[in-house]
């Protein structure tokens, strides 16, 4: 069982915790609780003490990370694992700024979060430099590139409505983190505002335009070679059921992006799985006469590094208007993916055995042939160790276990080859920052238990990315969080090594001195083991059967499959 910090649970009847005087911090806690929040991530700080004092009088569970960036990753993981809003408390200045890389990932991937950052007292705000601790010229401006919106709350009575509005914005598509900041004195000063009794936040409706759905149906009804790219928006919009129905009506091959991994059944006869970076898949998608793109910008990875040159028409569905037609012209439908696909599915009336032919080949046979080509290409590249390593991990992981992947060679393989089954695949593919996997997994495990569905999760990192979040071993131990952390240690930044050797013939500044990860984990009180690559499956199974956190270290040098956008 996860152990939350002492002093953050409700006091027994007749007893009090913290001070007896209500303040602005109480309004924050009360509003969050009324909105359904149960857990908060963050680190205490001087200007934020009013928040933490108030938590002592409320029911919010608090998970304290060791670095604010990891707190942001944890709140992100909490949201991805549960579908709920992640909540993050930050202190002023350095604390707030340290969170920004984590927030960039949430913003890029569309993860709903409410961020409450403290501020210096009101009297210090503005153009004057009063020399207050942690003072920034404009703190919320620093968050502008990584959050949907930013707001300064200047009086206590405005706190409940501001948080309610932020929650609504966070869950409205396109989803993402919303930034609020509250000055120290507004959090600490006594208030006359009564306790918050209720709060309601509902996502704004984001349906597709009727005429655009009608036009898309017209295109698809006459298409001979329809195909579908399912991006991350498919999962965020919970559109999996509609996607399956549409694909089967059209007999359209479906490929998932890294963010869309799991949106379509891996073993379905129309599934091209997630081999989005393979040239055989790029060729197939280019040959589609109508291509449906859901929740994807057709960006760098999805377009096979901008080599994708579609010859047919594109129907692009996305809640973010800036994404539509940003890389390829088409029929742009600005809408939530769930609502758009439901409308398209309802309007698309076609027999299940609708005639479809890709130049004389049935779509189902084309899928088999394409996957066979991918398999043959991989088998021609001396990648037996890598293929077995990923297969052994997949075999060891229970079908319903959620996994969190850092930016590491194993994750890049996972983007293409990981069958999520009944679990979920989460990675830092949005912004691509290092250090995501372990703290996000911590947040995910906390979320599952908090919502009454406890379960172990897996984090996967390289030795380079592991050092970004190594301090969170203390967090995992303190809260007894059921996370198994697989660290694949190749002695450096493995993917950078490959990139540099490929581009320049040699690698520079990619080799790393690193600790003995087993001894380091044990120093935190976390059980750890080091195994050979061929034993990774058994080691993971043992870790999954244990209680609390544990670490599995594998020292091995993995290679990536050859890129195909360069003609390979």
Where are these regions (language model features)?
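Glycine-rich, acidic loop regions that bind phosphate or pyrophosphate groups
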Residues: 2-7, 119-161, 259-363
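Structural signature of the thiamine diphosphate
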Residues: 2-5, 38-39, 80-91, 95-117, ...
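Glycine-rich, anion-gripping cofactor-binding loops and their flanking helix/strand elements
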Residues: 60, 80, 232-317, 420-451, ...
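Active-site diphosphate/adenylate-binding microenvironment
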Residues: 25-29, 33-35, 43-56, 365-451
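Phosphate/pyrophosphate-binding active-site segments
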Residues: 2-19, 154-157, 218, 310-407, ...
């Amino acid at each position: 069982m996860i152990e939350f910090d002492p002093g953050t649970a409700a006091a027994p009847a007749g007893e009090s915790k913290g001070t007896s005087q209500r303040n602005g911090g109480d309004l924050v806690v009360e509003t969050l609780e009324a909105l359904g929040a149960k857990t908060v991530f963050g680190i205490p700080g001087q200007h934020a003490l009013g928040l933490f004092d108030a938590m002592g009088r409320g029911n919010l569970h608090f998970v304290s990370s060791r670095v604010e960036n990891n707190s942001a990753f944890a709140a992100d993981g909490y949201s991805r694992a549960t579908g709920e809003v992640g909540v993050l408390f930050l202190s002023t200045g350095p604390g707030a700024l340290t969170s920004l890389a984590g927030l960039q990932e949430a913003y890029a991937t569309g993860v709903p979060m409410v961020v409450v950052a403290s501020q210096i007292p009101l009297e210090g705000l503005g153009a004057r430099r009063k020399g207050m601790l942690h003072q920034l010229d404009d703190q919320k401006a620093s968050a502008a590139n990584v959050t949907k919106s930013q707001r300064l709350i200047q009086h206590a009575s405005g706190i409940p409505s501001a948080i309610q509005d932020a929650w609504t914005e966070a869950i409205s598509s396109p989803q993402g983190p919303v930034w609020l900041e509250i000055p120290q004195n507004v959090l600490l000063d006594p208030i006359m505002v009564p306790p918050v009794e209720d709060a309601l936040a509902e996502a704004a409706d984001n349906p597709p335009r009727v005429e655009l759905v009608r036009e898309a149906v017209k295109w698809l009804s006459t298409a001979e070679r329809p195909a579908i790219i399912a991006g991350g928006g498919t999962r965020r919009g919970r559109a999996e059921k509609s996607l399956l129905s549409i694909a089967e009506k059209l007999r359209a091959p479906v490929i998932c992006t890294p963010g869309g991994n799991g949106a379509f059944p891996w073993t379905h006869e129309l599934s091209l799985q997630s081999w989005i970076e393979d040239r055989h898949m790029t060729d197939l998608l280019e040959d589609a006469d109508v291509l449906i793109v859901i929740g994807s910008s057709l960006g760098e990875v999805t377009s096979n590094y901008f080599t994708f040159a579609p010859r047919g028409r594109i129907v692009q569905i996305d809640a973010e208007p800036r994404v539509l037609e940003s890389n390829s012209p088409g029929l742009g439908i600005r809408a939530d993916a769930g609502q758009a696909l439901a409308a398209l599915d309802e309007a698309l009336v076609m027999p299940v055995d609708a005639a479809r032919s890709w130049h004389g080949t049935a779509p189902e046979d084309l899928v088999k042939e394409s996957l066979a080509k991918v398999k043959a290409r991989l088998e021609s590249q001396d990648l037996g160790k890598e293929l077995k390593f990923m297969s052994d991990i997949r075999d060891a992981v229970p079908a319903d276990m959620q996994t969190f992947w850092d930016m590491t060679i194993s994750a890049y393989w996972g983007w293409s080859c990981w069958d999520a089954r009944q679990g979920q695949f989460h990675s830092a593919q949005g912004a691509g920052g290092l250090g995501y996997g372990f703290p996000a997994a911590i947040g995910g495990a906390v979320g599952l238990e908090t919502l009454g569905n406890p379960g172990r999760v897996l984090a996967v990192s390289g030795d380079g990315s592991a050092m970004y979040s190594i301090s969170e071993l203390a967090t995992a131990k303190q809260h007894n969080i059921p996370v198994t952390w697989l660290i694949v240690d190749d002695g450096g930044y493995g993917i950078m090594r490959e990139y540099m050797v490929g581009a320049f013939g040699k690698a520079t500044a990619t080799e790393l001195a690193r600790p003995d990860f087993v001894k380091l984990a044990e120093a935190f009180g976390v059980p750890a083991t080091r195994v050979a690559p061929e034993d990774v499956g058994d080691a993971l199974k043992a870790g999954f059967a244990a209680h609390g956190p544990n670490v599995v270290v594998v020292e091995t040098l993995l290679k990536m499959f050859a890129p195909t956008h360069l003609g390979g």
